[in-house]
Amino acid sequence: DIYPSWVAVAVIVAFLITLINVLGAKTAAVLQTVLTCIIGGAGILLIVASVINGDSSNLQGQMFVGESTGTMFQNIIKVAVVTPFFFIGFDVIPQAAEEINVPLKKIGKMMILSVVLAVVFYSCVSLAVGYVLNPSEILSSEAGTGLVTADAMAKAFGTAVMAKVIIVGGMCGIITSWNSFMIGGSRALYSMAESYMIPPMFAKLHPQHKTPINALFLIGALTMLAPFAGRGMMVWICDCLLYTSDAADDRISV
């Protein structure tokens, strides 16, 4: 399904993110910082409100789902199998390492710290949702809006307006991922061009901002064209790329 309004939104956002990255890594980093603060602020509001207005009895039956220890363990493993994909965006850090204004020895520590903080933050958000909504309310939310976290935020504050706040935070999360992959993808093309793995034209830097302009233009153009393919094609492409990138990582590791 292709909706002109959403295609227009996607094209405009893709253009703006491309432009921001052309203007320099510092400009893109400022955008990333601002949006991350919004995400953190929305999450902290939910966590604090859940502590004040939540009920610990709502967590009963939600912590470990299963009829026995064996089924509980199976359900934990099912979630554990997919959790590595939650951290796929962190691979952008080494790709942009040359432009990070910190000692190289600290980059590894920063990556580990960022992963730990992300685990703590999203674990607290998950607990906050379970602290505010009981199992039946969660099922009702999934069958209705599908925005369980937003519904938890609305209940915690007693107003539907706060649901919009958490939705804005979620949108910021999408944009930060989009922006980070733009940074990482363009730097990957730049490095490959410098190594003559792809045409050298992708190693060209902007005369003023020193950004890989041709690589950014290519990624930006493909990103702006992608929404016209529709959701079905996009899901298929993403699945294929995820599979092939994992296979490539395995080959490189070997």
Predicted feature descriptions by range:
Residues 37-64, 127-133, 251:
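Hydrophobic alpha-helical segments and their helix-loop junctions in multi-pass secondary transporters
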Residues 1-11, 56-75:
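Inter-helical loop and helix-membrane interface segments of multi-pass membrane transporters/permeases
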Residues 243-250:
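Conserved small/polar residues in nucleotide/adenosyl-binding loops
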Residues 1-25, 40-46, 215-221:
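Transmembrane alpha-helical segments of multi-pass small-molecule transport proteins
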